[in-house]
Swiss-Prot record:
Protein name per the record: Guanylyl cyclase-activating protein 1
Residues annotated as domain EF-hand: 30-48, 50-85, 86-121, 129-164
UniProt-recorded Gene Ontology molecular function terms: calcium ion binding; calcium sensitive guanylate cyclase activator activity
Organism field: Lithobates pipiens
Keywords assigned by UniProt, alphabetized: Calcium, Lipoprotein, Metal-binding, Myristate, Repeat, Sensory transduction, Vision
Gene: GUCA1A
Length: 205
């Protein structure tokens, strides 16, 4: 799973791990979650091609050993990253999620498609359109103007821009997924969704 994921897993309590293990084995008695089961658990049906690609990309980034399954430790690492991951850890994961073709760079098309897919799944109605958000990201952090973002450009640029970090974190808030895991697959109503503390990844009161 790598050092990044190990650090977040170590921060989990035994109670949390036990609860997640019970839930995981209830939903997936075989101990290995397939991509199809991953979609099924979250009630993701009739997805657009872009949304379907996003979910498959998310699954692949959490399938750390690339065997086509998510086992319990990968499941824990994924959830701990969402709940307790530090900003840089989350940004590295976001980058992997955006880099659909795996070439080590994010282009405008990749970012735009992922943002559209996330908003469709999260049922977001942000004031800023996906196109405007994508333009803002590239205008602010594509330092060399080549139309692609390297990992270094992405992490350094986002961390230096408080507004961009806030918008990015809000756009990629995955706490609704954790809510569904903890509440037997029920979707979180928009009014229930927690505001995120940008610097720590925790919810604000």
């Amino acid at each position: 799973m790598g050092n990044m994921d190990g650090k977040t897993v170590e921060e989990l309590s035994a109670t949390e791990i036990h609860r997640w293990y019970k839930k995981f084995m209830t939903e997936c008695p075989s101990g290995q979650l397939t991509q199809h089961e991953f979609k099924q658990f979250f009630g993701l049906k009739n997805l657009s091609p872009a949304s379907n690609q996003y979910i498959e990309q998310m699954f692949d980034t959490f399938d750390f050993n690339k065997d086509g399954y998510m086992d319990f430790m990968e499941y824990v690492a994924a959830l701990s990253l969402v709940l307790k991951g530090k900003v840089e850890q989350k940004l590295r994961w976001y980058f992997k999620l955006y880099d659909v073709d795996g070439n080590g760079c994010i282009d405008r098309g990749e970012l735009l498609n992922i943002i559209k897919a996330i908003r469709a799944i999260n049922r977001c109605n942000d004031e800023m359109t996906a196109e405007e958000f994508t333009d803002m990201v590239f205008d602010k952090i594509d330092i060399n103007g080549d139309g692609e973002l390297s990992l270094e450009e992405f992490i350094e640029g986002v961390q230096k821009d408080e507004l961009l970090l806030e918008v990015l974190t809000r756009s990629l808030d995955l706490k609704h997924i954790v809510y569904m895991i903890q509440n037997d697959g029920k979707r979180m109503e928009i009014s229930e969704r927690p505001r995120q503390e940008i610097t720590t990844g925790n919810s604000l009161p």
